[in-house]
């Protein structure tokens, strides 16, 4: 039985962990995840999905604020683990820890070398990629730069957003890891170096990148909106107030960018630099998320054709 330390944080990681727990070839000696955080306006302390899964399985849990140089790292190195599996952990692993293991692999939610970094699923959508995927890779000190052990792709559809793609790729990652790990541990797979000429980066999204620029095409804005749904959520401004857009569809239309072209009971169409967007799910300032019909029947009932979204 191979003894593992698992490191991860969000739902994506929890799915991978649960997969490992179903395979009797592995023993999870410890789980490392990010510390509990205060979430929302009420600052409710929330455990990570990986911590919740680990508690349900009765596993030992470590939550260092920073792994490097921590007492927790020293404890982990004394457990006698054969290797480390990480999946969206959110911290760099110190070389000292990596060097103490027989192997260390990462489940990364992109088709490397494209989309290295912390937001690969977001950027796959924002940049209009036709496919997404998962790469199992060896861990090295440089971010997502290790040799690739295996890859698996799936198509991106127009119905996908960050939430749906996370769910799909979590299952892909779980299955690919379980399919790959035995042969890798046995030495039957020769990892492939990444083509550095094809590397792209997908860092965590900055607040200023959430703002919609109506001078882009309808397709570009469509991709940005779904590439931030359900988090961090794209926004614009309406009458000076922040206005979040969770879902919109590209449609035909022509007008000044940001201009309202059409309003009816269940449709609000806004011009872009090329074509238009039909807004489907929105959140006005100080209100909950709602469908467009609810918005137009409520706080949006005073809107008129010709008014504009934007600064």
Swiss-Prot record:
UniProt key word Metal-binding: no
Uppermost EC category: transferase
Catalytic function, reaction form: L-methionyl-tRNA(fMet) + (6R)-10-formyltetrahydrofolate = N-formyl-L-methionyl-tRNA(fMet) + (6S)-5,6,7,8-tetrahydrofolate + H(+)
EC number annotated for this UniProt entry: 2.1.2.9
InterPro entries linked to this entry: Fmt, Formyl_trans_C, Formyl_trans_C_sf, Formyl_transf_N, Formyl_transf_N_sf, Formyl_transferase-like_C_sf, GART_AS, Met-tRNA-FMT_C
Cellular compartments per GO CC: cytosol
Residues bound to (6S)-5,6,7,8-tetrahydrofolate: 110-113
Intrachain disulfide bonds: none
Keywords (A to Z) from UniProt: Protein biosynthesis, Transferase
Molecular-function annotations in GO: methionyl-tRNA formyltransferase activity
Keyword Transferase: yes
Alphabetized Pfam families for the sequence: Formyl_trans_C (PF02911), Formyl_trans_N (PF00551)
Its job: Attaches a formyl group to the free amino group of methionyl-tRNA(fMet). The formyl group appears to play a dual role in the initiator identity of N-formylmethionyl-tRNA by promoting its recognition by IF2 and preventing the misappropriation of this tRNA by the elongation apparatus.
Family, similarity comment: Belongs to the Fmt family.
Protein name: Methionyl-tRNA formyltransferase
Higher taxonomy: Bacteria, Bacillati, Bacillota, Bacilli, Lactobacillales
